[in-house]
Curated annotation (Swiss-Prot):
Gene: eif2g
Catalytic activity: GTP + H2O = GDP + phosphate + H(+)
Amino-acid positions noted as binding Mg(2+) 2 in the UniProt annotation, renumbered to this chain: D19, G44
Binding residues for Mg(2+) 1: T23, T46
Protein name listed in UniProt: Translation initiation factor 2 subunit gamma
Gene Ontology biological-process annotations: formation of translation preinitiation complex
Pfam families registered for this protein in UniProt: eIF2_C, GTP_EFTU
Amino acid sequence: MAWPKVQPEVNIGVVGHVDHGKTTLVQAITGIWTSKHSEELKRGMTIKLGYAETNIGVCESCKKPEAYVTEPSCKSCGSDDEPKFLRRISFIDAPGHEVLMATMLSGAALMDGAILVVAANEPFPQPQTREHFVALGIIGVKNLIIVQNKVDVVSKEEALSQYRQIKQFTKGTWAENVPIIPVSALHKINIDSLIEGIEEYIKTPYRDLSQKPVMLVIRSFDVNKPGTQFNELKGGVIGGSIIQGLFKVDQEIKVLPGLRVEKQGKVSYEPIFTKISSIRFGDEEFKEAKPGGLVAIGTYLDPSLTKADNLLGSIITLADAEVPVLWNIRIKYNLLERVVGAKEMLKVDPIRAKETLMLSVGSSTTLGIVTSVKKDEIEVELRRPVAVWSNNIRTVISRQIAGRWRMIGWGLVEI
């Protein structure tokens, strides 16, 4: 009997400094190399959000952690009994390079839990290790596992010394008691212990499917090959993660903020209306989709609207749902004490009127000018509007420091 075909039910972010082995770790668990983009293969680093999913099961004849498997057979004991299916999970592989922080933040909005990857053969913490750690805390991703990777290239003493540094780093923070699991992703050593950790510490959250459905868009594309006959063209495809509610094939939907329209020098956005033609997770088609995993929604849209990630940062909801699209937003904010991500730990200066900030709201990243500053509240006029699907959505606030956008705080968007 084969395992059931189900959609993934939890999104796990894989974050950390560039070259610490995030993509190799995802491959060790799932068998999938997530860097598929030609530029990524050439440069050997993740640029877009990578993605992979896998099943998790448990062999009832084996002891844990060896009992955990990702396919319907057990290599540990060779038992004829099929391991019991537990759930399907998905991994979002975030880029670790500092210039791609906005991409990491758009991915963090989709994460139910995270794995912070630390290379055992480098000083700890590296700038983006610290930056990603702070970002997870800000966005509220509290189910964390720290993976000490590349333990095969250091001595036991060096690995233990770094383990103590990690414990010291998390002491007194929200992550004080998170598990630290040593692995070698390259040699697939201790991956079963990591899967056990995922089952224990990153549970599937409760999903209220009666809420109005909302999907955050992180990709959109044209699946037609050049030269396709007009009558064989397929509509645009939109990829992302559902954060609440349930979508079904044939539902009428809208994309917000929508299409940029310029009339007499004034820019506005108009919602894009369409219908769901198909729902896919990986290679499997489904009739409906709920939160968990990255979903590809097929539509009847002109593919020129969706090509080359054109709709990145949008949201999808039902055609008749009321969702405000705002050019001016009010944020109840908190500043960090120090700027994270830079080599030197600079003090965060107060926000000033008329300065330009970068705001990450859901999967959208937009720039805005501060129009008013009060004690714990700012008003910002945006260059590109954002769709705000509920009150108190978390936003990450970044400021340009020495030519790079750096996280300086977070806030709740009030509507």
